[in-house]
Amino acid sequence: HLEQVFTDHGVTYTRTGVTEKNLKPDFILPGIVHYHDATFPQARLTMLASKSTCKDRWRQILNEAERIPNKHLLTLEPSISENQTCEMQAERVQLVLPRRLHSTYTPEQQTWLMDVAAFIDLVRQRQLA
């Protein structure tokens, strides 16, 4: 599904490209070749992990792409606890959710959540820079 969304919006990406320690993040945008190119600006790189549910598994993404300090995590899990989302923020993990799930989070959490459209806009801006 995500790959189709990326294609529909003209977003380039690599699925499960290999990074440090032979790790394979779900998506590197614009691509793994750019990730490994030391001259490519770090600010234009994006990593997106995709997990249908998070629980404590979200921490697995923290070391998947060392060049990208701010990670994005797409999930379909409603109402993750405030403790968990505070930990995510502290670890620089931005939660991305379909807009319809935002209402399952507290008003304070909702101010920080990103929807899929905003993620696509961010990535497109980075790819056009």
Give residue spans per PLM region.
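Catalytic core segments in nucleotide and nucleic-acid processing enzymes
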Residues: 7-129
